[in-house]
Amino acid sequence: MNDQINELQLKIERLENEISFKNGLISILSHDSKEMFGNFLWLIEALEDKTINEEDFFNLLPQIKSDARKNLQTIQDSTAWLKTQYGDFKIKPVKILVIDLFHHFEEKYADQLKEKSIKFHFKGDPNAFLTTDRLLLEYVLDKILNNAVKYSLPGQDIYLQEATEGDQVILSVIDSGTGIAEKYLSAIYSYDNPVFQGTSGEKGVGLSLKIVKNFVSLLQGNIQIISAENKGTTVSLFLSKFTE
């Protein structure tokens, strides 16, 4: 009887978490979309009514572009998550060399790394591998690395580190950027966490890490974030070497 009660409690907690996640997702999409389109409409009407001159109009375009990019990222993140909610979604494990992941992101982030003079390094066994869903893992690492670049200062280093312990592979993205104050760490996966600007004014969307945690669970793994203000952040993924 106790086992059945415990199982029901776990199911209730899981459903409550899913409902909370979906409600938060709808709230973010609604708020951000209204804000962005409201800004677009105001800017166009101001230009039509000649209450803003062309110089001020063009000066505001970089901010509008930044807001549009942020909202596009929110939609892309939401779409990625929604695909995992379809009834026929299944993990598709394939063998992945960790060094291949490094080279993939080294190429993908080449322009951003160059722009901020950041060096990207690999630490670990170049022959290390794991068998898991490549799309989900790449999404997770992409969001973590994106934050590392965003919150690193020009000239700093970022590492993708691999460590294999028995049947477990630990992948860590390590930076020495602005870090996160301890008071914010406990809320890092909630919808109440603050959204910080990157070191070059980049905007966060406040959603990616919530989806990252969800995807890591789908990969039957765990995520750990260790961070200190002005000392950098280490985000580690604890994954099974073989995922069924």
Each model region followed by its residue ranges:
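Conserved catalytic submotifs in the C-terminal HATPase_c
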Residues: K92-I96, K114, K119-A128
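Short conserved segment of the HATPase_c
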Residues: I180-D192
